Design a protein with these regions (language model features):
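Short amphipathic alpha-helical interaction segments
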Residues: 237-251
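Minor-groove-contacting beta-hairpin "wing" of winged helix-turn-helix DNA-binding domains
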Residues: 262-266
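Extended hydrophobic-aromatic, low-complexity segments
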Residues: 228-229, 241-242, 258
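Solvent-exposed, charged/polar functional surfaces in cytosolic regulatory/catalytic domains
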Residues: 128, 132, 249, 253, ...
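C-terminal scaffold of the Radical SAM
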Residues: 1-237, 275, 285
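A short, conserved structural fragment
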Residues: 251-261
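Short, amphipathic alpha-helical interaction segments positioned at domain boundaries
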Residues: 268-285
Length: 285
């Protein structure tokens, strides 16, 4: 939810429902950068929202942050991290600002109105985040996610571990291990179809190559990494051998490590996880 959406009524309603976590998109506590993102809320709204949720009895709160803004310094980012820690929330997620094609931000960069943050700076910001949150007692359990003991996101973890899930409502996605389904995103049409007794959705059947690549991409995001024993059971010993062959150069350069039956990213590999995953996902193509 957005921090400015959290009032007493919202908090009381959520507390009365079987909701086990509330996640808020704080993004930053810097007023200029909030305006840059065109966010409605202020930095103080985040603290007020956490307080309202706590008073309503919500004991599991997550806050999302962003870093790598144009002209952002290490000192700016450190202040955001410290402010987030002062909230005392159970879970934190942090993502580097991305310039996605077709977005206003992408257009601003292309027109020279903003400059993308230097990669060495964003790398340093990432490791500052990791070090500071781990020192504060948070488990770094996924590339971008941190949790106090016993407070991992079970919802997102089901995606990363390949557990089947069902999505309910317009635009909701589902997965059963062999296919992905998604409901149409047009709410009025969705409601009318449901009234007619029909759930309007599309479906994508996954072949072994796609399922294999999903396993690589999702499992590597977790600190536990890829369970090679599970890979062998699902895709055969040849798939494991090919995966290990492709992994060899990353093991030599210290980006991946093999620990027992698990292939996992090292601390150095976490920041370049997307590159490593893309190399390993060529298996089965």
């Amino acid at each position: 939810c957005n921090p400015d959406d959290v009032d007493d009524t919202f908090s009381e309603v959520v507390a009365a429902l079987p909701v086990n976590r509330v996640s808020m998109g704080a993004q930053t506590f810097n007023a200029d950068r909030l305006r840059f993102l065109r966010r409605r809320h202020s930095a103080s709204d985040v603290a007020k929202a956490v307080d309202k949720l706590r008073r309503a009895g919500i004991g599991n709160i997550s806050v999302d942050l962003m870093y790598g803004f144009p002209e952002e310094t290490m000192e700016d980012w450190e202040r955001d991290i410290e402010t987030a820690l002062q909230l005392g929330v159970e879970h934190l997620s942090a993502y580097c600002l991305m310039y996605e094609e077709g977005t206003p931000l992408f257009k601003m960069r292309e027109e020279g109105r903003v400059a993308e943050a230097d990669e060495e700076l964003t790398r340093a910001m990432y490791y500052l985040l990791v070090d500071r949150l781990e020192a504060a007692g948070y488990e770094h359990y996924e590339v971008s996610n941190f949790a106090l003991e016993g407070r991992r996101s079970l919802h997102n973890s089901s995606y990363w571990t390949g557990i089947p899930y069902m999505g309910i409502g317009a635009a909701a996605h589902s997965y059963n291990g062999k296919s992905r389904q998604w409901n149409i995103d047009n709410l009025p049409i969705y409601i009318n179809k449901v009234k007619e007794g029909v759930v309007p959705f599309e479906k994508e059947l996954l072949d072994d190559s796609e399922r294999h690549n999903d396993m690589v991409m999702l499992a590597l995001r977790r600190r536990e990494g890829i369970d090679l024993s599970r890979m062998a059971l699902e895709f055969g010993a040849a798939a494991v051998e090919e995966c290990l062959s492709l992994s060899r150069k990353f093991v030599k350069t210290g980006l991946l490590s093999i620990e027992g039956s698990h292939l996992r990213l090292t601390r150095e590999g976490l920041y370049v996880s997307d590159m490593v995953m893309s190399e390993l996902m060529s298996v089965g193509d």
